[in-house]
Amino acid sequence: MNNEKKYLLGLTLAELKQVAKDLGMPAFTGGQMAKWLYQQHVKSIDEMTNISKANRAKLAEEYEIGCFGYSDAQHSLDGTIKYLFPTRSGKFVETVYIPDKDRATLCVSSQVGCKMNCLFCQTGKQGFEGSLPAGDILNQIYSLPEVDKLTNIVFMGQGEPMDNLDNVLRATDILTADYGWAWSPKRITVSSVGVKNKLKRFLEESECHVAISMHDPIPAERAELMPAERGMGIEQVVELLRNYDFSHQRRLSFEYIVFKGLNDSMQHAKAIIRLVKGLDCRFNLIRFHQIPNIPLQGVSDEKMEQFRDYLTQHGVFTTIRASRGQDIYAACGLLSTSKKIGEIRQHENEQA
């Protein structure tokens, strides 16, 4: 993906106007570019037909759109599709399209790999290979074949969004701006384990929904599952969240993978109730999907339902999230591109 040209995808309206100005074009040309990019999703500069041919040629000398189609797609029996997208750095990320009866959700990645190294997550086992620029985050949406069907976007793919906050905020700003996709921020959810200093900034600068990966309410146990607990503990996270209003349109949720014999007891349920008491939130219980060489197990459906019912009866609105795409390794915690990179490059060499 590396070349001498610069990319337009991921630039704000102000930056597009500056591009136009630097090339000797009227400032309003930047607004025209924004519409072609973020509302028409053009694949080439030549498709921007209300910009003069001479100005298009001038623009194309230094810039290109910066959109890249998917390199691979896997289809689940339940309708979920996992796409493999190339990035500008030559690496790959996985993106999951999840259609349902009355909605279609896209799970996007914000990094290649992840630094958080959660015990139960395949992405963490890949290691960290880099943060995505806003253009690569947006490309997962821009180049999605089903882009016109999308109703929701969740930042729950590869990577920790708060560890790439500048680019995540830039991407969500473009998604919600009038010149951009013009989406309501209520259609976007950003997930986090809780990263010190970054979570506070996100809460203040974004109106998108927030999902916190809790997975265990007891700090010492959570630290064993999630090393990030040692940086910003779950109790600190909850105290920070108490400073914000989630009683209206903005939603706060907690993600909780239920592990057999680890975080599924009444002690844990009671600890959750104490921890979030008075906080306007919901809990999503998630089934654990087995990862090779990881000595963790999921619980039965009956146990999940008992845990849900106990929390609900004690005032914590709780649901069990349906698992989607498990047969193509697209479910929660299973995304990884370490193997795929080699497969794609081998295929490219065979085609050469």
Set out the residue ranges of the language-model regions.
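Auxiliary Fe-S-binding modules of radical SAM enzymes
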Residues: 1-93, 242-250, 258-352
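Short linear Ser/Thr-Pro motifs
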Residues: 76, 109-110, 191, 213
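Generic beta-strand structural signal
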Residues: 81, 93, 104-108, 116, ...
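P-loop NTP-binding catalytic core
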Residues: 89-98, 102-103
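Canonical Radical SAM [4Fe-4S] cluster-binding loop centered on the CxxxCxxC motif
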Residues: 99-136
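Ferredoxin-type iron-sulfur electron-transfer modules in oxidoreductases and energy-metabolism complexes
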Residues: 135, 139-147
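Conserved AdoMet/S-adenosylmethionine-binding subsite of the radical SAM
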Residues: 145-152, 157-321
